[in-house]
Regions:
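A short, N-terminal "cap"/entry segment at the start of jelly-roll beta-barrel domains
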Residues: 1-29
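Ligand-binding loop in jelly-roll beta-barrel domains
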Residues: 82-107
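Histidine-centered active-site/metal-ligand motif
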Residues: 46-48, 52, 86
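Short, surface-exposed secondary-structure edge patches
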Residues: 44, 53, 68-71
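Conserved short histidine dyad/triad with adjacent acidic residue
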Residues: 33-47
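Short acidic-glycine-tyrosine-enriched beta hairpin
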Residues: 68-82
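Glycine- and acidic-residue-biased ligand/ion/polar-headgroup-sensing regions
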Residues: 50-61, 66
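Structural motif
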Residues: 31, 60-62, 69, 85, ...
Length: 109
């Protein structure tokens, strides 16, 4: 097992909402999360103390962050400061996003 190149089965997989699955890989100070959203699935409004930045890598979704709403597609990036309410609704194509959290989200380990 390599410290630098994780195996495909390393990390953890969770269904966080119906139709929304995450695959995570923690480091000492941050966490990588691959979020796969089925068509029309929803990440319900929530907030957390972690900073979050991300990029849509496939499909498209409506992001609502701090009351501001925007449709984001492949290559679009976003940032969610600590404590800011946010939600995501996948469109008909579904969506895949890559998120980075700081610090590590213990609830996703």
């Amino acid at each position: 097992m390599s410290l630098y190149f994780p195996e495909e089965n390393e990390g953890s997989v969770h269904q966080i909402f119906p139709g929304v699955q995450i695959r995570t890989l923690p480091a000492s100070e941050m966490m990588l999360s691959l979020v796969t959203m089925q068509p029309n699935s929803v990440v319900q409004p929530h907030s957390h103390p972690h900073e979050q930045v991300g990029m849509v890598v496939e499909g498209s979704a409506i992001f609502c962050i701090g009351g501001e709403q925007k449709v984001l597609g492949k290559g679009a990036m976003y940032r969610i400061p600590s404590g800011v309410l946010h939600e995501v609704k996948a469109l008909e194509s579904g969506a895949v996003a890559l998120d980075i959290f700081h610090p590590v989200r213990q609830d996703y380990l």
